[in-house]
Amino acid sequence: MAVLFLLLFLCGTPQAADNMQAIYVALGEAVELPCPSPPTLHGDEHLSWFCSPAAGSFTTLVAQVQVGRPAPDPGKPGRESRLRLLGNYSLWLEGSKEEDAGRYWCAVLGQHHNYQNWRVYDVLVLKGSQLSARAADGSPCNVLLCSVVPSRRMDSVTWQEGKGPVRGRVQSFWGSEAALLLVCPGEGLSEPRSRRPRIIRCLMTHNKGVSFSLAASIDASPALCAPSTGWDMPWILMLLLTMGQGVVILALSIVLWRQRVRGAPGRDASIPQFKPEIQVYENIHLARLGPPAHKPR
């Protein structure tokens, strides 16, 4: 008997949250959360679904129905309008959003048996974003960012194109809240395939993930190439450097011009100026004051 109690203590009861499961769903997609019937029922049990959002600390009642009832409760209006109870007592989430991330669990309560946390799910919403970049040689690249709500480590992310690895020059990064993939064109892409859009997926467990669509590459044919109108980092730095040099030259020119203007009157005052009218006057004046010339007899 003591051994039996020890086993029950170690293994736990069915209503313990041992069935907790992480469910990944892409942003905007639907997901079904099963709630199978407990092994023992007496007909007076009520099945309830609860939700505790990841962004808050409150718990809401999503749906409730009596076990064995032919038509389940359609649910409440408002946020729960996208949540509905199916005929098999599963909870259906339509068009998942970021605020839908959180913990969901079903409970089967009755007079004889209480399955408080019969099934517990941690719903995580996957989302992705796509950016454009340029490599060191000027070739266009794509930056694919895959993240999850609520934030958690993305070490188990795998990047896949079709049924195999991503082609081209790729470099992956993993962080505490997101996973990033840098995709640049390379020799791995064949000519017919490079003219079609590429589908790359960021996959988590159970083949759940986010899909990215990369535009078809047109740089394989020189006739189709068009001059790039984008501003990359080297051109921006060169433009800023040129503008800075122009501003410095203009400032130096203004300073030199001001010094020249200020110094011109000083130089003119130190150099004696020739004035013809004053010189003539002085000659006449000296001639009148001098003694008359002696005439020989």
Swiss-Prot record:
What domain of life is recorded for the organism? Eukaryota
Is rRNA-binding among this UniProt entry's keywords?
A: no
Localization, per the record, is: Cell membrane
Q: Name one GO cellular component term.
A: plasma membrane
Topological region Extracellular? 17-235
InterPro entries cross-referenced by the UniProt entry:
Ig-like_dom, Ig-like_dom_sf, Ig-like_fold, Ig_sub, Ig_V-set, LY6G6d/LY6G6f
Q: Per UniProt, what is the membrane topology?
A: Single-pass type I membrane protein
Report the leader peptide range: 1-16
Q: Which residues lie on this side of the membrane: Cytoplasmic?
A: 257-297
**Modified residues annotated as Phosphotyrosine in this record:** Y281
Using the record's annotation, list all stretches that form the Ig-like V-type domain.
17-122
Which named protein is this?
Lymphocyte antigen 6 complex locus protein G6f
- Sugar-modified residues: N88
Q: Which UniProt keyword terms apply here?
A: Cell membrane, Disulfide bond, Glycoprotein, Immunoglobulin domain, Membrane, Phosphoprotein, Signal, Transmembrane, Transmembrane helix
UniProt-listed SMART domains: IG (SM00409)
PTMs per UniProt = N-glycosylated.
Disulfide links within the chain? C35-C106
Sum up the protein's function in the record's words. Answer: May play a role in the downstream signal transduction pathways involving GRB2 and GRB7.
Show the taxonomic lineage.
Eukaryota, Metazoa, Chordata, Craniata, Vertebrata
Oligomeric state and interaction partners are given as: Homodimer; disulfide-linked. Interacts with GRB2 and GRB7 in a phosphorylation-dependent manner.
Q: Where do the TM regions start and end? A: 236-256
